[in-house]
Amino acid sequence: MTETNKNVDALEKINQMSSADYYFDSYSHFGIHEEMLKDEVRTLAYRRAIINNRKLFEGKVVLDVGCGTGILCMFAAQAGAKMVIGVDNSEMLPIAQKIITANNFDKTITLIKGKMEEVVLPVDKVDIIISEWMGYFMLYEGMLDTVLYARDKYLVPGGVILPDKASLYITAIEDQDYKEEKINYWNNVYGFDMSCIREIALKEPLVDVVQPNMIVTNDCCILTVDIMTITKDELKFRSDFKLKALRDDLIHAFVVYFDIEFSKGDKPVCFSTGPKAKYTHWKQSIMYFEDHIKIQQGEIITGTMDCAPFDKNQRDLKIKLDFNFAGELMKSSSSLEYHMR
């Protein structure tokens, strides 16, 4: 079978995939890649980190973990990499091969379909690993585990990973209107009691955009990740936090977001997915709780967050959040559990 016929068959396979197929291979759907590529904060940060650090890439062997459409592979080739290897396990890979060929990078870029843990690379070691591994809540989908596997098996001593640093933050917001729409709506649906769904909705973090004027407290870093050194076990974390009210208001939810840093090379790059930063497709993760907190400026909420993958599905996150508040107007404490899926 010719390479052209293989690519045509790949297109036909994607066209025939059902919604059930997409559930297990969601990254085969071009719409997901369109959303990520059109996220200019994300894509331009990677391009700047690679293209503007040509000295880092010239003559090097580069591995892209989860290469998708191959966009990062092509950035690396443009930056002068000697060889770029892209690995992906979705049905998008043959389409990525067409893209690579159409842009005349097929002599530099080699794409391999399969799981990173199972494929055989054409080299023993690589100089640089690039990957867009972040999910909602930063750790959702568990792809960072795969990057760490590739690091431990393939990265040369003194090699580089991009991005190489990440930080996870928590803050608290006033959000009465949206809580009514998304959570309390289920108490009365066309006259019917559907409050059992409300209980489920409260346990699932909502991925959405938080407006800056909704923020009531400062933010607090609950996890810092150095991808060069962190272990898989350290991604299961327990962290204390302290949030201070910036004004008198009500609090209806906690919000989690992350920052990413490409610190290597002559021109470091960073971006934030926080409410005060420019929109990204990751948005923010909102965790509502049953009641609300009436807080005054300067008062403190203390708490602890535990986060780990679910045993049955390592892509999902199990999040436990305990908080205590003793203000002048009210006291409140709660132990909350969430399922990010």
Swiss-Prot record:
Catalytic reaction list: L-arginyl-[protein] + 2 S-adenosyl-L-methionine = N(omega),N(omega)-dimethyl-L-arginyl-[protein] + 2 S-adenosyl-L-homocysteine + 2 H(+); L-arginyl-[protein] + S-adenosyl-L-methionine = N(omega)-methyl-L-arginyl-[protein] + S-adenosyl-L-homocysteine + H(+)
Biological-process GO terms, alphabetical: chromatin remodeling; mRNA export from nucleus; negative regulation of megakaryocyte differentiation; peptidyl-arginine modification; protein methylation; regulation of DNA-templated transcription
Localization in the cell: Nucleus; Cytoplasm, Cytosol
E.C. numbers: 2.1.1.319
Source species, domain of life: Eukaryota
Gene3D superfamilies, per database record: Hnrnp arginine n-methyltransferase1 (2.70.160.11), Vaccinia Virus protein VP39 (3.40.50.150)
Active site: E132, E141
UniProtKB keywords: Cytoplasm, Methyltransferase, Nucleus, S-adenosyl-L-methionine, Transferase
UniProt-recorded name of the protein: Protein arginine N-methyltransferase 1
